[in-house]
Amino acid sequence: MDEAESFVPFQGIKKDVKGRLNCYKQDWISGLRAGFRILAPTTYIFFASAIPVITFGEQLERDTDGKITAVQTLVSTALCGVIHSIIGGQPLLILGVAEPTVIMYTFMFNFAKSRTDLGSNLFLAWTGWVCLWTGLLLFLLAVLGACTFINRFTRLAGELFGILIAMLFMQEAIRGIVDEFGVPGRTNPRSAEFQPAWVFANGMFGLVLSSGLLYTGLKSRKARSWRFGAEWLRGFIADYGVPVMVVVWTCISYIPWKSVPQGIPRRLVSPNPWSPGAYQNWTVIKEMVDVPVLYILLAVVPASMIAVLYYFDHSVASQLAQQEDFNLRKPPAYHYDLFLLGFLTILCGLIGIPPSNGVIPQSPMHTKSLATLNHQLLRNKLVAAARKCIRNNATIGEVYGSMEEAYQQMQSPLIHQEPSRIQGLKQSHIQKASNADALVDETVFDIETEVENILPVEVKEQRVSNFLQAMMVAGCVAAMPLIKRIPSSVLWGYFAYMAIESLPGNQFWERIVLLFTAPSRRFKVLEDNHAVFIETVPFKTMAMFTLFQTAYLLVCFGITWVPVAGVLFPLMIMFLVPVRQYVLPNFFKGAHLQDLDAAEYEEAPAILSFNLKPEGEVSRATSFADSGEVMDGMFTRSRGEIRKVSSLKLGGGGSGSTVGSPAGGGVELMRRVVSFQNPRVSEKVYIRSLSDFRGGGEISPRSSAGRAPFSPRSATGGGGGEQRLSNLGKSV
C-alpha cells in the first residue's frame, strides 16, 4: 500500500475488508475439508495458548487480591478468540492475555488501591474506563493507517523482540520455581505443608516436575526422527507429545499422596466459574458511573500506554504469522484487525475482564503448524500421482506433469489472491530439461526427495483451527476443577519449554552462541546447514553487530524491571527502525548489514569435505523419514520462517549422476527447480573445502578423499565459477 494513500481515513480498513471478504467462504471450506487432520494443529496451539493464560490468571489473582483470576483470563482469551476467528481479518493470528497486560493491570490495581476515593472496590470499574479510552485510541490508529509503519520492521527488530519474549518467559519460569521454595501469601504459615522441611520438599519436587516436563517436552518434538516405534506412534508423540507430557507429569505428582501433606506439590489456585467471587466482574458496567470524573479523565494516561503496546504487539504478531516466506495466498488485514481489537478491548473492559491481543510466539507457531498440515496433504497426493505415472513407464516430463495436475486438483482458486508458487512449473521448468523425454527408473529417481525439492511451502489458510482452539479454551472454564489439579511447577516447566523452543533458528541467538564458541571449533558451524552471513561477513563485523544487538536487548530487558514504565519496552523496539535506517549504516558496510539483517532466513549447505559420505549417501541423508519431519527441518522456530537451503544436488559434474536426478540433465533440471523457488540461490557461491575455510593449506583428514564443487554456477560441470572464501575465521 502506498504510504500517502494509507493516511486517507478508512482507506486501509476498506481495502482490508474488501480483500478478506473475497476469501471468507473459502476460509471455512478449506478448514472443513482437512477433516480430522485439523485437530493436530488445533491441539498444538490450544496448549500453547491456554497454559500461559492460566498462569497469567494465577499471577493476576495474587497481584489483584483475587479481583481477576484465571477464569477471567480464560474467558477473555476464548471470547476474543472466537470473535476474531469469525469476523477477524487474519485468521492465523492468535489472541490471548499477554504478560504486558498482566503488568499493566497490576500497576493499575496498586494505583487504585492507594487512592481512598477509588479503592480496590472500584478497580474493575476504573479499568473499564481505561479500556474504553484504549479502544478509542486503537480506532484512531486503525482509521489513520498507522499499521503501515509495521512493514519497516526488519529482522534486527523482530529477532531481538523474539529473544526478549523468550527471556520474559524464562524469567517467569525461574521466578515460579523459586517461589515454590517459599510460603505463598494469603495462607496460614502454620499449616503442615508450610513447615520448613515440607516447604523445601515442595520446592525440590516442583523442580523435578518442571525439569521433567521441560526435558520430555523438548524430546517429544523430535519424535519423528526416533529409530524406535511405529511411524504413526512417532507422529502422534511429535504432534501431541507436549500436552501428553503435561498429563503424565500431573499424574506423577500424585504418586506420594499418602506420605506428604495435602498441599504438596502446590497446584493452581483459582475459583470455579460458578463460585460467588468469580462472576462479580460481569456487572462492572453498573459501577462505572461511580468512578469520580477526575479518574475517568486520568484513565487516558494508562490507556495511551496500553494502546501503544497493543498497536505494536498485535501488529507484529500478525506480521510474524504471515511472513512472505510462508507463501500466503490471501491478503493481510492489519488495519481492520487493529480496528476490531479496539472493539474487543472495549467489550472486555465493560464486562470486567482483561483484554486480549495478538500474542507471540503463538501466532507464528499457529502458521507453522498449518504449513506442516498442508505440506503433508500435498506431499502424499503428489507422491501417489508420481508413482502411478512411473508404473506406466512415463517420462520425467510426464511425471512432473502428473504431479502438477495433482497439485492443481487440490487447490481452490480464489478471487484477488496471490498465485500459487508451483503454478506453471511444468511449462517453465520441466520442458527446459534436456532429458525431459527420458524414461524414469524408480531405483535412481527418489520420488519423495524430488517432491520435497519442488513442493513450495504453503499454509492451509482457514478459520477452523483458530475457532476450535478458542472453543477449547472456553471449555477450560468449565473444566476448572480438573485444571486446578495441575501442579503449578508443571506450568513453570512449560514456560521454560516455550522459551527454549523459540531460540533455534533465530540468527541473533546463533551469533551469540558463535561468539562463545572456541576459535578452534568455529569451523564446526560449516559442517551443518548454516546462515549465509557466516560466509559473507567478517567475524569481527559479525561480533560487533551481535554485541550491539545484545547490549540493546539488555537495555530493553532492564526496562521491563522498571515500575510502571517497564510496560513501554515495545517503544525501544520501535526505536530500532530509525536506528537501523540512519545510525547503523555509519558503522557497518551496507552489504554486511544486508546479510546480517536479511528479510529471509537463507542457509548455505553443509560442506561435503567435512565428511566422506558419497554424494548419493549425503543426498539421501538429507531426506526425512516422513512429511512431518520435513517441516521440522525446514522451519526455524523463533519466527516461524522457512529456511532457504541450497540443494546438495546442485553440486556435481554435468556428466555425472546423482541420487534423485537422472544423469546429466537431471542436475540441470533440479538446478532450475530450486532456482525457481529461490532466485537468490543462483547468485550464491560457496566454499569447497576446509582449507578454503581456514584460509590456508591445512586440510582436515576427513577431506582428503576429494572435494565436491558446490558452486551453482558450475553445476553443469563447467569450470571457471567464482570461488568465495568463508569469512568466519577472518577479523577484517
Swiss-Prot record:
Keywords: Acetylation, Anion exchange, Ion transport, Membrane, Transmembrane, Transmembrane helix, Transport. The chain crosses the membrane at residues 38-58, 78-98, 124-144, 158-178, 198-218, 235-255, 292-312, 340-360, 464-484, 557-577. GO terms for molecular function: solute:inorganic anion antiporter activity. It is found in: Membrane. The modification N-acetylmethionine is found at M1. Probable boron transporter. Boron is essential for maintaining the integrity of plants cell walls. This is Probable boron transporter 3. It comes from Arabidopsis thaliana (Mouse-ear cress). The gene is BOR3.
